[in-house]
Amino acid sequence: VVSAYLEFFGEGASALTLSDRATISNMAPEFGATAAMFYIDDQTLRYLRLTGRDESLVKLVETYAKQTGLWADQLAKAEYERVLEFDLSTVVRNIAGPSNPHKRVATTDLASQGISGTVEATPGLMPDGAVIIAAITSCTNTNNPRNMVAAGLLARNANRLGLTRKPWVKSSLAPGSKAVALYLEEAALMPELEKLGFGVVAFACTTCNGMSGALDPVIQKEIIDRDLYATAVLSGNRNFDGRIHPYAKQAFLASPPLVVAYAIAGTIRFDIEKDSFGQTPDGKPIRLADLWPSDEEIDAVIAKSVKPEQFRSVYEPMFKVRLDSGEKVSPLYEWRPKSTYIRRPPYWEGALAGERTMRGMRPLAVLGDNITTDHLSPSNAILLDSAAGEYLAKMGLPEEDFNSYATHRGDHLTAQRATFANPKLLNEMVKKDGKVVQGSLARVEPEGNIMRMWEAIETYMNRKQPLIIIAGADYGQGSSRDWAAKGVRLAGVEAIVAEGFERIHRTNLVGMGVLPLEFLPGTTRLTLGIDGTETFDVIGDRTPRAQLTLVIHRKNGQSEKVPVLCRLDTAEECSIYEAGGVLQRFAQDFLESKAA
């Protein structure tokens, strides 16, 4: 389904609530689709009424859909290029991980998949696989009433049986809407969640995007001192290596009620379906089945406690007209040279405004498959010993105010230091005893010196050395993070040659003036024996999906010509690229319109 437009239909789809449909559709990037759609039907109208829309709007939606042929009944005979069947009756509880959202594991198979095992705990110490972060988070799961009510009911059941969250677990609740907190309060479930440590920390993007905040210093020290295998469990969309927290070596995605259960278990080694959470007063083991609420109970709570007025009270004030009677603001921003949050951007000056040579490019990195935007530009907490941390300290910020990479995206001097700053990066140019060394590392050529990635970037920037990146399949998957393209462009990368690109990231590369090139089938960095000592030229006319020539100049003086596919897919993309990127193109169009 990669790059496909999906439309769900059938008996199962018609029975899904709109909240469940939205949860599925919001995961479209994770299963690689361009879009995931459901038809308009009575479930749609029911949701509009539940969320407080005016009856006139509900009627308009129904009338418009029926008049335009978009109503479910009129799509019953629609023909599709491909039809994939999925039986909803086969759905069971799952988690996803480690490291990728598509690594689905049924909770009944945790032991056979090597995730759960013997829980080896020493009194006073965290166990192997300790869950250091348990977060009910993400715009996807927290806007689904069934998921949130299920989490609240599981918390209530756990509290009644005397279960508690393990002390090393940092737990949080970040609903995607204030309406969620209102209906949890209405159902008397918010106090139950708070009792287990799941109080509301924000109505915003938090742990899912690597912004969980700092760990308890004592817990952090133990993780470092013992080199502990620590994990995170969250109800987010993505769990790529290094994304959630620098000290969570791996992360697992789970539903909100499972997140609560893992906070009580305290370790990913716990077999969540089979192991005992504790004992009842009469000595009976407490298992997940004893905590999990029934569908009937969830439905009853939703019917009683989720009300239209909750949504109206949250959203109606957002659309009220307000007149600002304050001081007039200058139309031009007054740049502050000491700011680490917003700084005058460099995209229209210096090397970024100059012509890309496509000659003599040296590899900044040679990478494998499935490189994510979290590898390219992480968004999580900034550590003191990182390049960005050292820069912020030099700017006078105390460590507790470093915040996350995501919050400093308006300051290119901070944000560009995030380029390849993921400690889980595997740059095949950096090896020890024949094995690739994990870390934010690079090898500067022609000297062959291994150093931190940012120092290598600075070295090449000072030399005005044009750069290239060589990669495997699915380059740039994950969040559509603009800095994953901005960072490499600021570093001096002119082209990226990969076996394949994630759709949105390829578009972002074009928008930043970085040329995406694709190896032809059967050709890879491995078949070409690329080790990073080479220099590269790109020859040919850059037209939509043209075949260009990648010239590889070997260290021994030999050269090799390799055909590659130009992934400027349209004439418009070619125009944007040749202008230097979308920002330069915008500036050109603006100046031309002013001159006209």
Which residues make up each language-model segment?
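Generic beta-strand/beta-sheet core signal
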Residues: 9-11, 19, 31-34, 38-41, ...
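Acidic, glycine-rich flexible loop/linker segments
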Residues: 280-294, 505-576
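Mobile "lid/hinge" segments at catalytic clefts and subdomain interfaces of large enzymes
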Residues: 1-62, 71, 149, 155-170, ...
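Non-catalytic terminal/interface segments that mediate subunit docking, oligomerization
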Residues: 84-188, 192, 323-497
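Structural motif
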Residues: 3-7, 34-37, 83-85, 130-132, ...
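Hydrophobic alpha-helical bundle architecture
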Residues: 192, 199, 215-225, 234-235, ...
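Conserved phosphate/anionic-ligand binding catalytic regions in large, soluble enzymes, centered on
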Residues: 18-40, 99, 132-150, 203-208, ...
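Extended hydrophobic packing segments that form well-structured cores
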Residues: 247-255, 259, 266-268, 272-370, ...
